[in-house]
């Protein structure tokens, strides 16, 4: 992804539109399965030797971190697809306004790459806001709303899991 240029992103966006409902199911299912597995794993901590506890905790933290990153990576691809999808005239749909583009003509505007979409995705996921990138399309606005809600629920579950784990270890 890091080495892909804009033409690569356009080609992928035109050729592969993973259905939204399937993407949603994969992301939510994967994140939920990860949290359930971590809860199951951490429920076995009592009575384990210290080195085994550390291993279980490490695996649990790693699984949650990877599931959290997966959510935002999938939304990175959705934002890229939505941006480089074409309208009836064959132009990019766009929908995100980058700070570098303010006051510039269309031909001088930034052609975002995956890192730009990843930046947007992770900012939405971590802060539930868009920071310095504006949204100018209804489709991306709805995607960002869904992303924010999923991220809020996932982040809340992580906080609850952390508090429960710490509470269980202190008893």
Annotate each language-model stretch with its function.
Residues 21-28, 54, 58-60, 117-120, ...:
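Alpha-helical transmembrane segments of integral membrane proteins
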């Amino acid at each position: 992804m890091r080495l892909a240029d804009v033409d690569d992103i356009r080609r992928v966006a035109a050729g592969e539109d993973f259905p939204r409902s399937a993407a949603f199911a994969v992301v939510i299912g994967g994140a939920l399965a990860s949290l359930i597995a971590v809860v199951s794993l951490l429920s076995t901590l009592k009575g384990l030797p210290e080195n085994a506890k550390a291993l279980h905790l490490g695996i649990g933290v790693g699984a949650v971190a990877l599931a959290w990153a997966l959510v935002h990576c999938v939304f990175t691809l959705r934002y890229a697809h939505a941006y480089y999808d074409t309208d009836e005239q064959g132009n990019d749909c766009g929908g995100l306004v980058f700070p570098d583009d303010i006051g510039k003509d269309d031909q001088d505007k930034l052609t975002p790459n995956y890192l730009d979409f990843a930046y947007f995705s992770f900012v939405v996921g971590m802060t539930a806001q868009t920071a310095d990138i504006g949204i100018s399309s209804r489709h991306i606005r709805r995607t960002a709303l869904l992303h924010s809600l999923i991220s809020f629920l996932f982040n809340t579950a992580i906080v609850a899991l952390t508090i429960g784990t710490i509470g269980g270890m202190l008893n």
